[in-house]
Design a protein with these regions (language model features):
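Non-globular targeting/processing and membrane-anchoring segments
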Residues: 1-41, 45-59, 63-119
Length: 119
């Protein structure tokens, strides 16, 4: 789990402990947060079962949420699950989301926070 002080955006990586793409999802999220300079709290949330997945709104492992919203603009799945997740990216199938999706989600979250006067 990684956090930054004065976080304004919440980023959750929902994943099983044994998920083969959990580590790479975290690396990509941290890299995008660093590149954008957007203050964010990054948390890895254990999703051990389909019940956990439903509770946390995970469409597979790993799922990346920014302020509670999936970063994938066009998810392949609609059911909550702790199974491995495949993302449809411009590179082809991938086990983690595109950095651009994470960046766009962070920018939307900041714009939403600012427009609501809560920033």
């Amino acid at each position: 789990m990684t956090t930054q002080a004065n976080a304004s955006v919440r980023v959750e990586i929902l994943a099983r402990e044994d998920c083969p793409n959990r580590g790479m999802a975290l690396v990509v999220v941290e890299r995008v947060v660093d590149e954008t300079g957007i203050p964010a709290e990054i948390e890895v949330v254990e999703v051990a079962s389909d019940e956990d997945a439903e509770e946390h709104r995970a469409l597979g492992s790993p799922t990346v949420l920014v302020d509670g919203r999936d970063v994938d603009p066009d998810p392949l799945y609609s059911d909550y699950s702790a199974d491995d997740r495949i993302y449809k990216t411009h590179r082809g199938p991938s086990g983690w989301p595109e950095p651009e999706w994470i960046r766009d989600a962070l920018l939307r979250a900041v714009a939403h926070t600012t427009s609501n006067g809560t920033h």
